[in-house]
Structure formats: C-alpha cells, structure tokens
Design a protein with these regions (language model features):
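A charged helix-plus-loop insertion that forms the helical arch/lid used to bind
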Residues: 80-94
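Active-site nucleophile and cofactor-binding loops and adjacent substrate-binding regions
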Residues: 87-90, 110-116, 136-139, 299-306
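ATP-binding/phosphotransfer module of carbohydrate and carboxylate kinases, centering on a glycine-rich
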Residues: 1-66, 76-81, 99-109, 121-131, ...
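A short acidic/small-residue loop/turn micro-motif
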Residues: 32-35, 90-91, 160-163
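Short hydrophobic alpha-helix segments
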Residues: 29-31, 86, 157
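Short beta-strand segments
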Residues: 8, 68-72, 112, 136-142, ...
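Conserved A3 ("GATE") glycine/threonine-rich loop of ANL adenylate-forming enzymes
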Residues: 13, 115-117, 141-144, 170
C-alpha cells in the first residue's frame, strides 16, 4: 500500500494525517502549534505529529512515499523554504522547512500554501466537486482564500486569493500584516483575540479568558469562541458579529469580481461554528452582491478540520507524479 502524509500547519494547531491511494485517512495526530521558540521548534512538532499519525496507521515514517505540508507565509516549494509566517512564533525570516523535515523523517517533502492546498482538497474531494469555479474562504487564525477557475487552482502571479487582505474599511483597524482596514483585522481569530484583550483592559467583562484557562489553553481557540457563543457571552457575540460583517463585505466583493459558482467556508472557526454561521455569512454577503438574483452557493467545507492536511497529502501525490 502506498501511504502519504499531509500536514496542515496552522496558527494554533498542527494537524497531520496518513492517507492511502484513495486519500482515505488511516491515521491522524493533532498537536498544539508552539507559541514560543523558533521555526525549528515548529518543525520538531510537525515531525512529532507525522510520527503519531504514522503510528496509528501502523507505519513507520520512513515507509511513507512522500509528505506534503500546507503552510502559511511565503512558501517556496522549489527551494523548500517558508518565509514570513507571521502567525507562527518568530518566523519572520526564511526557514528550510522541507529539508528539516526530510532530515528528520526520511521521505521527500513538498510545500504548499495552506489555503491553496485546502481549497484544492475541497475542489477535488469535497464540497466543491460539482463546480468548475469556486472561492475557498478559510476563517481561522487569519482569513485565507483560494480560487478555482475552470477547474484549476488560480494563483495569479503567485499571490492570488489573499482575501483576508482585501480592505473592508479605509483607514480601519490595524492588521497583523501591518496595513489598515483588512478583512483579517476584523475577522481573523488572532485579531479578534487582540481586540478582546484590549476590551478587558478597559474593564469589560467576558467569559472568554476564563474558558481559555479552564481548557488549559494559551490562545482563544475556535472551540473557546464556540463555547462562549453558546453561553451568549456579550463580548464574544459582538466580536463575532463584527467579524461576520467584515467577512460578508469582503467575500461578496470577491464574488463580484470573480462570479464564482460556489463559496466554500472552512478554517478552524468556519468549521467549528458550522452551518448556522455558514447561513449567517450567506446573509451578510447578500447586501453587497451585485448579481443578487443569482448569488453563489455558500457551502461548509465537507472535509472539515482534516481538509488542509488531506490537501497537503494531495500535493505530495502530485509532486510524486511530477518527479516520476
């Protein structure tokens, strides 16, 4: 049996899977993304996650035919590097991630943009399979986008799909990218947490950080936001409403430009909050869609939390074919 591993490297979690030739998941492992240290520490956690997934699949890492990694930041698969992964600790410069993992685990390693590989997974194996054009929107630590046109991933000049950095308010809130008014400055989980901390310093009350401490977390994960919403925590409700307003305007603007058939909502928050918030995104988009008599389908990512990792395994398979 030909086995491959795929890794989704996120701001709060590292998700690894081992799949067979049909991309059925035989083993998986999830680990927390380090909040301190250097890129080498993140690479060590990735390697540990792959080992864990391989063990569950009753395989050794050396028996894998290849490994794919979907990473944030500026990904250079040809040189095996990731640069400026701002949602990861101290990852401003370039780090040879592919080489570090290959030295540690053995099989060849391919790198891809995290959102692009997740988008291709949904287009090839998930909710996007009936469509020739779609926009993947991945709502998590940041807000990422992937574009499929005529059945193919569209990369532009290698930076297409950065939907989180579409401006939804001129001169608005500062984004982690350093610019102002980006959708991610309102809807990214990292920015939402930063805003929650600011409000607490000003004296506002919330259960968010009490839930975080009870769960033994250092960050406000998607699960913590979901629990706070169940409790109808006023701050959580207000910040999620603010995020949905920004998402609705930004995603609708992208739809006006591309006229895609479908929007696929994924990412940690998108998947965790689920169908009720898919419907709310759809509602938030409608006032901004020009062709509102035929809006695109808005669908929840079918592959769920594993979509990014499965997409990375799909990338590894494509790289094997290219090398053959």
């Amino acid at each position: 049996m030909n086995l491959r591993a795929g890794v989704d490297l996120g701001g709060t979690k590292i998700q690894a899977v081992v799949v067979d030739e049909r991309f059925s998941v035989l083993g998986q492992e999830r680990r927390a993304t380090p909040t301190k240290g250097k890129p080498a520490d993140v690479a060590a956690e990735i390697a540990a996650a792959v080992r864990g997934a391989a063990e569950i699949a009753d395989a050794e890492p050396s028996e894998l035919s290849s490994i794919g990694v979907g990473s944030p930041g500026d990904v250079d698969d040809e040189n095996g590097t990731v640069t400026s992964a701002r949602n990861l600790p101290n990852w401003e410069g370039s780090f040879p991630l592919a080489g570090a993992l290959q030295d540690e685990l053995g099989p060849p390693v391919s790198l891809g943009n995290d959102v692009n590989v997740a988008t291709m997974a949904e287009a090839t194996l998930g909710a996007g399979t009936p469509y020739q054009s779609m926009l993947g929107v991945f709502w998590g630590t940041g807000v990422g986008g992937g574009i499929v046109l005529d059945g193919k991933l569209w990369l532009g000049r290698d930076a297409a799909g950065e939907i989180g950095h579409m401006v939804v308010k001129v001169g608005g809130a500062k984004c982690p990218c350093g610019r102002h008014g980006c959708m991610e400055a309102y809807a990214g989980r990292g920015a939402m947490e930063a805003r929650a901390r600011e409000l607490v310093k000003k004296g506002e009350q919330t259960d968010l950080f009490a839930i975080m401490e009870k769960r033994g977390r250092e960050r406000l994960t998607s699960g913590i936001w979901a629990r706070a919403l169940v409790r109808q925590d006023p701050m959580a409700v207000r910040l999620v409403e603010r995020a949905l307003e920004a998402l609705g305007a930004g995603v609708a603007s992208a739809v006006n430009l591309l006229d895609v058939e479908a929007v696929i909502l994924g990412g940690g928050l998108g998947v965790r909050l689920g169908d009720p918030y898919r419907k709310r995104l759809e509602h938030a988009m409608l006032p901004h869609i020009f062709a509102d008599h035929r809006p695109p389908r808005v669908l929840l990512a079918q592959l769920g939390d594993l979509g990014g990792a499965i997409g990375a395994a799909l990338l590894a398979s494509q790289s094997e074919t290219a090398r053959a």
